[in-house]
A protein has these predicted regions:
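Catalytic core of pol beta-like nucleotidyltransferases
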Residues: 1-39, 47-54, 63-122
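Short beta-strand->loop micro-motif that forms the acidic, two-metal-ion catalytic signature
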Residues: 59-61
Length: 122
C-alpha cells in the first residue's frame, strides 16, 4: 500500500525492490506451510519493471495437485501481508504442463516475464 514520507504529504508507491523482497519473504512462509507447492512467482508490471502508482501484484502458484475448482483455489491464500494489493492464480502441475505446451499469448507472456521466487526440483 502507499507509504507517506515523514516530511512530505506525497504518497509513494512501493518500489519493485520492496515488492520483490516482500514476495520472497512471503514465498518462504508459503513453502513452509504448503508442501504441495512446486513453483511460486509473479508476473505483470512488477515483473516487467513498468509498475506505477496503483499497480497491483500478479502472483502465480503451481501445486502438485488440488481438488478445488480453478475459480476457488485462490481463496485460501493469505495475501494480506504484501505491500500492494495482490491476486494469485493457482495451477495444478498437470494444468501447468498443459499450459506450457500451448502457444497462447498468456503462456508466452508467462514464459518471458514471470519472476520465479521458488521452484522445487521435480
Amino acid at each position: 500500500m502507499p507509504v507517506r514520507s515523514l516530511n512530505s504529504s506525497v504518497l509513494k508507491w512501493p518500489s519493485r525492490t520492496t515488492v520483490d523482497r516482500a514476495v520472497r519473504s512471503w514465498t518462504a512462509e508459503q513453502v513452509q506451510q504448503r508442501p504441495e507447492i512446486v513453483r511460486l512467482g509473479y508476473f505483470g508490471s512488477y515483473a516487467r519493471g513498468d509498475w506505477g502508482v496503483g499497480s497491483d501484484l500478479d502472483l502465480i502458484a503451481v501445486v502438485n495437485e488440488t481438488s478445488e475448482s480453478f475459480e476457488r483455489r485462490s481463496i485460501n491464500w493469505d495475501l494480506n501481508g504484501l505491500p500492494v494489493s495482490a491476486e494469485i492464480i493457482v495451477y495444478s502441475l498437470p494444468e501447468w504442463k498443459d499450459l506450457a505446451k500451448k502457444d497462447t499469448k498468456f503462456a508466452r507472456m508467462l514464459k518471458s516475464e514471470a519472476v520465479w521466487t521458488f521452484s522445487k526440483q521435480t
